[in-house]
């Protein structure tokens, strides 16, 4: 993964000038195929926003089973450069989850601690992690639409 922050400064400047809604801004980066660099772009943009923003910036990886973005900050060059990831915080924000586990987990465990956010070093960046280790064989995760 490459650090593309310098390439994204103009995009950040343009987006930061648009009015924010009550809860802030949401920016989504998507690609048609794997390997197109969307993880590098999203990570660099989140780091740039975290450097400039007054509030925390959340980097949410929708590839829940792989946790690629979390792992990027947990070990390796980005972990070394930014200080690794801190302890988990609930990422539920007291709302219904945007994902479902099928077949459903027992009610006592559904959603509890499955999706967490971790502060990256001393930055304002929070990166998410889905605890796929709690799923059993045959369980799947779906993003709700």
Locations of regions flagged by a protein language model:
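P-loop/Walker-type NTP enzyme "switch/lid" segment
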Residues: 2-5, 9, 13, 20, ...
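Hydrophobic positions on the alpha1 helix immediately C-terminal to the Walker A/P-loop
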Residues: 41
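Gly/Ala-rich phosphate-binding loop of Rossmann-like dinucleotide-binding domains
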Residues: 46, 50-51
